[in-house]
Amino acid sequence: MGTWDWQIFLQDTGGGRTYLEWMMSAWGWTMLVSVLALAIALVIGSLIGILRTTPSKALVLFGDAWTELFRNIPLLVQLFIWYHVIPRLFPALQAIPGIYLAVFGLGFFTSARIAEQVRAGIMALPKGQRYAGLAIGLTLPQTYRYVLLPMAFRIVIPPITSESMNIIKNSSVTFAVQVSELIFFALQSSEETSRPIEIYACVTALYFVSAFAVNRVMAVVEHRVQVPGMIGGK
């Protein structure tokens, strides 16, 4: 086993920056992709999850179809479809940078998982809450907004935390569509420097730090909004 050489991160890449600067830039792209994809996943996943609990059979069918479609196709395949197929079907999208297509692919994939969790959170509530909201004169949308969703979202914070951590880890797949994130950096720099141990050790540490930070932040949020007597509450 050779001696580890951490000074490689201070070496110039030949492009006017060091490998450390390149790695920090790649980390930034990883977090940007993750945050944008999570925002898409939360919005769409919440909407689909809500649709799957409505009295409308058509909306339930649409929500079920969305969930099964995006949940059962491998993430890498979905990214390739977004990157290679969609722009060919819709030429106007060819001008969109690949990173945004990757964000949509990752976001839609995760939305199916969040939809299932939101649906489960709503279904976990006592049925009397829905009936009580309607009985006092609230419309169905108002019942969801003021009665069901505030409770359901508190219940699903733990699984949403897991998905938030997973989306950071799943962003590593976007290297396959030329997103300059951490794995893309690791593959390129380890080949250039012939120091894969040092490179992958640091990349692994950055993934751990990112996911652990999300876990701790969400733990604080969960503690502040937990409902006594409900799942996760005391």
What label would you give each PLM region?
Residues 1-234:
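Transmembrane alpha-helices and adjacent helix-loop boundaries
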